[in-house]
Amino acid sequence: MFSWSADTVRFMADACRRTDFHEKLTALLLPYLKPTDHICDAGCGLGYLSLALSSHAAHITAAECDAAALSVLRQELDARGIANVTPLCTDILAYTPAEKFDAMVFCFFGSMEEILAAALRQCRGTVLAVVRDDVCHRFSGAPRAPGRHSFDAACGVLDAHGIPYTAQRAALDFPQPFRTLEDARTFLTIYGG
């Protein structure tokens, strides 16, 4: 599980504010979602995907276990006047909602096995897993086994379980701006592996 710190929150917020990544990702997800859906953005981090999805769904529950990360989302919701997103501080892998979600989005969150277990318990409809393909991934907050978190590995898990799915590859840019040279050093220390 990703560990948030003051530095990682700041780096992610700076990057999210300077890219259209979440809007482009939302455009890729929309064909699988309905405007009437109550969507769970599972492991939402700072919630920028929830913000992008908010104008396309009835309600978004933005679930994240780190209160500091969710505070960024709360600030953005207030600043933008968005009322249909509910931040929820919880471990989504252990959470059981009162009513199952219409759809769940897992964006760079959890193993495929964790996603399947959570979705089975929490979702009655569409499950979307946005998987980073480690073949192209250069930085990581923790060591990863080569290929373990790849597009092909995710498809392999679904195939092994006999779960029907639609797969789509996409390449979206997510640049990281730095305020100072020291920021760049800190970033590379954290994510350089």
What are these model-derived regions, one by one?
Residues 19-36:
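Conserved alpha-helix/loop element of class I SAM-dependent methyltransferases that forms part
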Residues 110-122:
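A short, conserved alpha-helix within the catalytic core of class I
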Residues 48, 55-82:
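Class I SAM-dependent methyltransferase SAM/SAH-binding core
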Residues 81-92:
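Conserved SAM-binding strand-loop segment of SAM-dependent methyltransferases
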Residues 150-187:
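Substrate-binding/catalytic lobe of Class I Rossmann-like enzymes that use SAM or dcSAM, i.e.
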Residues 6-20:
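Class I SAM-dependent methyltransferase Rossmann-like catalytic core
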Residues 43-47:
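Class I SAM-dependent methyltransferase "Motif I" SAM/SAH-binding loop
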Residues 124-137:
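Conserved beta-strand signature within the Rossmann-like core of class I S-adenosyl-L-methionine
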